[in-house]
């Protein structure tokens, strides 16, 4: 059993998802997530701007954010969002313990702003969700470019003058 399989079902049961729901969405998630990627969060969510568009299931791993949608009438599964965390920009979330919810927003690589509302049962779960999102988006995502740290008072290293040597033409 791979890492994704070992971590997905416990995360789904922790979120209170029925086993049927988790196993129904599993093939879609399996196509998007690598076998070595551990699940951080699985939860139901909705779209605040489209409340009647169906049920959504959000999967957050250390590398990807995947959201599936179940259509309201025929209950078909559709992939709504599949993005690496480093491809997402302007990621924000706002926890609201009074409403027992966290609103997550991110701009996908195609420029479309996605907003999801995650509801919890208790206010304490709002702060747990906030900590998970903070861990995933602030501490795990690093830029690929190395950081260059220098101070203004630092003197540059001695630069050797370029010496030119004549080339022998034959």
Feature locations, PLM:
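Anionic N-terminal interaction surfaces
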Residues: 1-59
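Acidic, Ser/Thr- and proline-rich intrinsically disordered linker/docking segments
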Residues: 3, 7, 74-170
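Generic preference for well-ordered secondary structure
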Residues: 13, 17, 23-25, 49, ...
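Conserved beta-hairpin
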Residues: 49-75
């Amino acid at each position: 059993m791979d890492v994704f399989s070992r971590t997905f079902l416990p995360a789904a049961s922790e979120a209170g998802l029925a086993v049927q729901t988790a196993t129904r969405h599993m093939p879609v998630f399996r196509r998007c997530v690598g076998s070595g990627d551990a699940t951080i969060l699985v939860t139901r969510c909705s779209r605040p701007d489209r409340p009647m568009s169906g049920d959504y299931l959000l999967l957050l791993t250390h590398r990807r954010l995947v959201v599936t949608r179940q259509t309201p009438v025929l209950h078909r599964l559709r992939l709504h969002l599949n993005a690496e965390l480093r491809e997402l920009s302007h990621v924000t979330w706002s926890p609201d313990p009074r409403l027992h919810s966290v609103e997550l927003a991110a701009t996908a690589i195609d420029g479309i702003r996605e907003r999801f509302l995650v509801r919890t049962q208790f206010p304490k779960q709002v702060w747990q969700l906030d900590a998970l999102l903070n861990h995933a988006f602030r501490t795990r995502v690093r830029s690929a470019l190395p950081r260059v740290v220098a101070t203004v008072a630092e003197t540059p290293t001695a630069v050797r003058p370029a010496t030119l040597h004549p080339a022998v033409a034959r």
